[in-house]
């Protein structure tokens, strides 16, 4: 019998090499936990980065709003004046049309 066949038989008959070690399920669980932990840390990092970016953007928006505050108020006042002017013009036009209609119906 060749020597290598003897070593193969010896290896196969030894129980510790033939059957999976009892720590294999533990290793698989640890591997799965490591994958989960790694993915979870990535997600937490992305959430933190997103929150930081939103905070920075809201601060910048707040600064812009403070700078634009007087301009916005002035714009609203101008819009209000135009609306009042338009309403007065429409009321004048409507009054003129009513007068013309009453003259036409009388005559």
Curated annotation (Swiss-Prot):
The keyword Secreted applies. GO terms for biological process: adenylate cyclase-activating G protein-coupled receptor signaling pathway; growth hormone secretion; regulation of protein localization. It is found in: Secreted. The gene is GHRH. Transmembrane segments: none annotated. It comes from the Eukaryota. The modification Leucine amide is found at residue 74. Residues 1-19 form the signal peptide. This is Somatoliberin. InterPro entries: Glucagon_GIP_secretin_VIP, VIP/GHRH-like. GRF is released by the hypothalamus and acts on the adenohypophyse to stimulate the secretion of growth hormone. Residues 20-30, 77-107 form a propeptide. Belongs to the glucagon family. GO terms for cellular component: extracellular space; perikaryon; terminal bouton. Keywords: Amidation, Cleavage on pair of basic residues, Secreted, Signal. One of its GO terms (molecular function) is growth hormone-releasing hormone receptor binding. The keyword DNA-binding does not apply.
């Amino acid at each position: 019998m060749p020597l290598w066949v003897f070593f193969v038989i010896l290896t196969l008959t030894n129980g510790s090499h033939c059957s999976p070690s009892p720590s294999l399920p533990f290793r698989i669980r640890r591997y799965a936990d490591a994958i989960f932990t790694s993915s979870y840390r990535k997600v937490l990092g992305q959430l933190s980065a997103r929150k930081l970016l939103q905070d920075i953007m809201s601060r910048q928006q707040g600064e812009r709003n403070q700078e634009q505050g007087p301009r916005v108020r002035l714009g609203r006042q101008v819009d209000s004046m135009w609306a009042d002017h338009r309403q007065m013009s429409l009321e004048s036009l409507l009054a003129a049309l009513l007068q013309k209609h009453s003259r036409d119906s009388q005559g």
